[in-house]
């Protein structure tokens, strides 16, 4: 692995970006140089910018205090089952203490689907669509989060967001290469309806563009 530009990520300032593009709806802090990740979260808290913490594989490189600084005050926290256990181990937090640090926690459980927890609301559990084949799991989590965040950008509810992410992750699982899958709008909606029903598919359909091609 060669970090390339990531080695200079800690030098990026968020303030000039906000000044240029305007207020941010949500800042996504994905796997990056750990020092940069913590710095972004500190800036987001100080500037009252909503942010999503998505530490992923960088949890292995971060210590407990760094993980705490990254997570505290996040609007969204994305973890898989292993990452959740690792976060609890390194921070010393209980599961309840961890959840209290964020507004919404999204946890994926592989073939057992995903869970969305939000304070004061019922927990949402979303199953995964039936896969056609299991070719390569690399990138499955990234695709889940991409689909989830796309749903957020379309102002969809968390259940729909998780369903979109789950189907996109399934396409990734069925393909060699993290972004090598192909599908048309019709193909995506057909599988989406099979997994989650006609009403859910109709809601998502309004946001998909015909330019999707096989």
Question: Whereabouts are the PLM-identified features?
Answer:
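Conserved phosphate/ATP/ADP-binding segment of small-molecule kinases
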Residues: 38-50, 55-125, 133
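Conserved phosphate-binding/catalytic region of the ribokinase-like
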Residues: 26, 91-214
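Short glycine/serine/threonine-rich phosphate/pyrophosphate-binding segments
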Residues: 36-38, 145
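Conserved phosphate-binding/catalytic loop of the ribokinase/pfkB sugar-kinase fold
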Residues: 1-26, 31
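Short acidic/polar capping segments at secondary-structure boundaries
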Residues: 5-8, 26, 32-36, 56-59, ...
């Amino acid at each position: 692995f060669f970090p390339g530009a990531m080695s200079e990520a800690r030098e990026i300032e968020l303030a000039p970006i906000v000044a240029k593009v305007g207020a941010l709806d949500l800042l996504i802090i994905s796997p990056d140089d750990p020092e940069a990740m913590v710095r972004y979260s500190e800036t987001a808290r100080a500037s009252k910018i909503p942010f999503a913490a998505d530490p992923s594989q960088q949890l292995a490189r971060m210590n407990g205090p760094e993980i705490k600084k990254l997570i505290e005050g996040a609007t969204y926290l994305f973890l898989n089952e292993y990452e959740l256990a690792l976060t609890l181990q390194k921070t010393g937090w209980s599961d309840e203490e961890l959840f209290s640090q964020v507004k919404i926690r999204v946890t994926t459980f592989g073939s057992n689907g995903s869970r969305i927890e939000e304070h004061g609301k019922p927990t949402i559990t979303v199953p995964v669509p039936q896969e056609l084949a299991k070719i390569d799991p690399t990138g499955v989590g990234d695709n889940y989060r991409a689909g989830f965040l796309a749903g957020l950008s379309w102002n969809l509810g968390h259940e729909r967001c998780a369903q979109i992410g789950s189907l996109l992750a399934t396409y990734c699982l069925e393909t060699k290469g993290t972004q090598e899958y192909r599908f048309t709008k019709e193909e995506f909606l057909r599988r989406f309806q099979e997994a989650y029903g006609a009403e859910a598919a109709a809601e998502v359909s309004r946001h998909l563009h015909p330019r999707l091609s096989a």
